[in-house]
Amino acid sequence: MCIVIGRKQEIAELNRRLKSNRAEFIAVYGRRRVGKTFLINEVFRDNMVFKHTGLSPYDKKKRMTMKDQLQNFYFSLVRHGMDGIEPPKTWMEAFFLLEQYLTRIDNGSRQVVFIDELPWMDTARSGFLTALEAFWNGWGNARHNLCLVVCGSASSWIIDNLINNKGGLYGRLTLEMKLHPFSLGESEEFFNSRGIKMSRYNITQAYMILGGIPFYLDYFNPAYSLAQNVDVAVFLKMQPKPTEIVSQFVHHLAFAAAVWNVPRYKTTFFECFQNF
């Protein structure tokens, strides 16, 4: 595993689950760019036997359908060595193929299955959640060497459908982990690991601007000043930039402008939003 900044408690807990002698169903969630996928890849790298990432629904030309997601899952199976199989038509078939694959390669050692961006796979009327339930309840939870790790940036989906599930997946998670942005101290540690020398005042400013998100902090160039790095990371159109920051600025500035323009006699929260 490469050097991971911070995340000491998270790494320790994930390693503890990795070494347990029982089936584990782990859900990791948190906002975008916070480092969920990176952390999971690094901790479970040596034991990961299957990895799949759901297709983003945010396509400019079309919205991803159940057929698209199933085809992508089929390609992941083939990529991992499942030759001679027909593309699944339902999620029940897809998870059954995954069962067959895991059974075929089982040598008794820990099997980590990582499904990234799980919420994206649950398209309308796809039966995805029911199939996931059948996979875990009917097969996975009896496999003492299986560790199913799911991840997603759509935190509300993870919370509603896994953590607070009232159906067949009620209480099935063995670990739920919310990954938070870096603290101020971890941000300083991150900059030091990248050879970026800044005063603590500038580190604090960077933290206030970028919020301790590792993906954004990684844009910093040690040859640039704080102002130059912020320009490159956020504002320069010709450079790679975290566009989410720009959209967040626009949203908050619009909200502030709406509140600022509310007449003084309009004091209720509801009335403020009517002007937004």
Where are these regions (language model features)?
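Phosphate-binding site recognition
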Residues: 1-276
